[in-house]
Amino acid sequence: MSKLDSLFTAALEQAAQRQVRRRLRRATAAPPGRLALDGRTLVNFSSNDYLGLARHPLLAERASLWATRHGAGAQASRLVCGNLDLHEQVEAKLARLKGTEAALLLASGWQANAAVLPALFKAAAAQGEPQVYTDRLNHASLHHGCQAAGVRQIRFRHNDLAHLEHLLAERAGAPGARFIVTESVFSMDGDRADVPALAALAARHHTFLYLDEAHATGVLGPRGMGLAGLAPGGVDLAMGTFSKGLGSFGAYVAGSRALCDYLVNACSGFIYTTALPPAVLGAIDAALDLVPRLDQARAALLGHGERLRASLAAQGIDCGASSTQIVPAIVGDAGHALALAAELERRGLLAVAIRPPTVPAGTSRLRIALSAAHGETELDQLIEALAAGWRAVRQAA
């Protein structure tokens, strides 16, 4: 027993009273687009496996093959003796697909944002305190990276480029390198940044653009390689993950050769972490072969999003500015979100309730994540269940 167990218990009780306590639930494998949870198989509308690749046979086969040939682990960090030829092979393939000089693999999206940003700001400190402009709805890992670096964030209104440009113009004469840190697709709202306009704005103001492509990679942009590909000349740094649209694990940054070489020398999350293992690299490599050829699956996925948003609007449920495979059903009250999620689960569908502090108070929601593994039948089930479930929640309120 810990000496602080009474404090931990009190904190959990307070979270339960606010209807924001979390609990782990045991899941087991099921066919793509589904999940076996607590002994029941549910249609899964909470997974980030947007293209249904997590159970694709090519990923599993190559993961197994590379593990058999090269071992279960990389044995060390890459700067010690864990830099396998496989890492460089995957990075070269990724850089070609992203249209950048280089790419660098990291262990997770959180690790990338939390470690890469401080490394960038450290280099920039030679010119004085950096100016860091961040979207108000950025992911927690981006905020964490800024906080870890000790920089002050200058926050602009969500996806409001006019406000961002105003803030940049206000500080035009101030010393220090300038950074814009934002996402191309926002994970809780499913809306997109105007990446070409962002890149043009960054160029006008001589500002480094850091773009988190976690939820765009695999789904959006040329060949599914993210929205940075829509900007002439690209962006300064694109971060993305392999754990969502690519059905595997890990993360990357893509940019100039000088940038990636610098991160090898300055990014703590790269330097002090054991390298990704061969099985993971094999799955990533296979996904990179598949994704550019999946335009039809991407079109169907985004079409399902359009149909779902139209249905939610007809029911009077707010889905914000979503324009992607992520569609929030924003119901406001945390209790209502939990009740609606429970009603859907009773009907055989998993759509997890998202509550504060993940989203602002008063904006609790179901975060509905669509997948190419879902067909019209599953979408029909979801639309019908949402309509009936929302009626039941309102009647009980």
From Swiss-Prot:
GO MF terms, alphabetically ordered: 8-amino-7-oxononanoate synthase activity; pyridoxal phosphate binding
Pathway linked to the protein: Cofactor biosynthesis; biotin biosynthesis
Keyword DNA-binding: no
Cofactor: pyridoxal 5'-phosphate
Residue positions, PTM N6-(pyridoxal phosphate)lysine: 244
A Pfam family of this chain: Aminotran_1_2
Positions annotated to bind pyridoxal 5'-phosphate: 109-110, 187, 212-215, 241-244
Top EC class, one word: transferase
InterPro entries according to UniProt: Aminotrans_II_pyridoxalP_BS, Aminotransferase_I/II_large, AON_synthase_class-II, AONS_Archaea/Proteobacteria, PyrdxlP-dep_Trfase, PyrdxlP-dep_Trfase_major, PyrdxlP-dep_Trfase_small
UniProt keywords, alphabetically: Biotin biosynthesis, Pyridoxal phosphate, Transferase
GO BP, one annotated term: biotin biosynthetic process
Residues at which substrate binds: 22, 139, 358
Catalytic activity: 6-carboxyhexanoyl-[ACP] + L-alanine + H(+) = (8S)-8-amino-7-oxononanoate + holo-[ACP] + CO2
Enzyme Commission number(s): 2.3.1.47
Similarity comment text for this entry: Belongs to the class-II pyridoxal-phosphate-dependent aminotransferase family. BioF subfamily.
Function (record text): Catalyzes the decarboxylative condensation of pimeloyl-[acyl-carrier protein] and L-alanine to produce 8-amino-7-oxononanoate (AON), [acyl-carrier protein], and carbon dioxide.
NCBIfam families listed in its UniProt record: bioF
Record text on subunit structure and interactions: Homodimer.
Listed name of the protein: Putative 8-amino-7-oxononanoate synthase
Organism annotation: Bordetella parapertussis (strain 12822 / ATCC BAA-587 / NCTC 13253)
Gene of this entry: bioF
